[in-house]
């Protein structure tokens, strides 16, 4: 995924720095789009793969690499076609990885928890829908004094708000 939905990097170290979550992107099926580099003294043509609306999009999987064992597991998130995975966040104990799965229409988001050991889905904590657009921009942030609660940022009512949730997926309150 490109610089959208709050994604500004492709790798995320665990809290202790012993595991690395990362995006793996296959864009071989995406049509090339020509861009002119106007910063060069003489303009140069650069082809980039960009999934235009209605055309085939890239496929992304999320992996977790263990440098000590040199093993990688991939999250069992199902078919990555026409889905975005964003807002990656580690559980404080690094046993779970949280991310938001967003459909290509960008109107249905799910906060999902995955096992770091197996890559299996532990559960969907909550879902957010909107008739027009859901734009998850920020990963969840766990409270430093209470690992059973986290803050989620959303514009679900048209304004940017912070929400306090429990790791059971239940809304505690709007902050």
Regions found by a protein language model. Give the residues of each.
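A short loop-to-beta-strand structural motif that recurs across blades of beta-propeller domains
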Residues: 61-63, 110-112, 161-163
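Short loop/turn segments that connect beta-strands within beta-propeller blades
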Residues: 66-70, 116-119, 166-170
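Long hydrophobic segments that form regular secondary structure
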Residues: 67, 71-103
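Beta-strand C-termini and the immediately following turn/loop, strongest in propeller blades
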Residues: 9-12, 21-27, 52-56, 92, ...
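A short beta-strand motif characteristic of beta-propeller blades
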Residues: 1, 71-77, 123-130, 171-175
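Predominantly five- to eight-bladed beta-propeller fold
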Residues: 1-12, 19-74
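Short glycine-/Asp-/Thr-/Trp-enriched loop segments that recur within the blades
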Residues: 1-7, 79-85, 130-138
């Amino acid at each position: 995924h490109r610089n959208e939905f709050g994604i500004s990097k492709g790798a995320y170290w665990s809290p202790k720095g012993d595991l690395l979550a990362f995006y793996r992107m296959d864009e071989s099926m995406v049509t090339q789009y020509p861009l002119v580099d106007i910063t060069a003294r003489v303009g140069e043509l650069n082809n980039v793969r960009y999934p235009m609306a209605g055309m085939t999009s890239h496929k992304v999987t999320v992996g977790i690499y263990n440098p000590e064992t040199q093993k990688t597991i991939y999250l069992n998130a199902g078919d990555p076609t026409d889905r975005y995975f964003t807002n990656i966040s580690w559980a404080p104990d690094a046993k779970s990885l949280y991310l938001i799965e967003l459909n290509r229409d960008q109107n249905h988001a799910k906060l999902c928890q995955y096992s770091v050991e197996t890559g299996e889905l532990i559960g969907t904590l909550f879902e957010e829908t909107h008739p027009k657009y859901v734009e998850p921009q920020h990963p969840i942030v766990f409270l430093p004094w209470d690992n059973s609660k986290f803050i989620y940022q959303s514009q679900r009512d048209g304004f940017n708000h912070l929400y306090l949730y429990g790791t059971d997926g239940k809304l505690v309150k709007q902050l």
